[in-house]
Amino acid sequence: LEDYIKIGIISDALRNYLLRLGWSYKDKEIFTKQESIDLFDLSGVGKSPSKLDMNRIFSINETYIKTIDEKDLFNFFKEYVLKYKKPIDQTKENVLLKSMGFLKNKAKTLEDIWNNAQYIINDKVEIGADDKKLIDDLSRKVIKDFASEYEKLSALSRESLESIIKS
């Protein structure tokens, strides 16, 4: 189990995958822990042998990442980072929590969220020489103003970002 968790599989998603190996309940694919307990019945166990399907594990994990409450997802992410990555500065945790809605969009694993969050986690963003030429004084001011307003947000959403951009 540790190897799956190490690559960023959420324990609840792995439990769901293991539950579905050889067992089914109607057309339902995703089960909460309580549903698993309430609905499991030996009559739903099939006779066919089961085989490991990593794509299916990633698919179930992605579903969990996309549908789980963002605070709960952040807690899974924080636990994952503390165990397998470097500690995150406390000041960045709030930004990560606010950004979880965006960070999870293209993620299938907690590792993907880690990779997607590097621009938040790392203090410095590398800007290439060609790109630096494109940033004039007005652009710097716009970026600083945006960053200042972004820090004040209590929750990150499309609407809140649009509001900052339009102001």
What are these regions (language model features)?
Residues 1-64, 167:
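Alpha-helical recognition segments enriched in aromatics with Gly/Pro capping
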Residues 69-167:
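Small-residue-rich helix-loop
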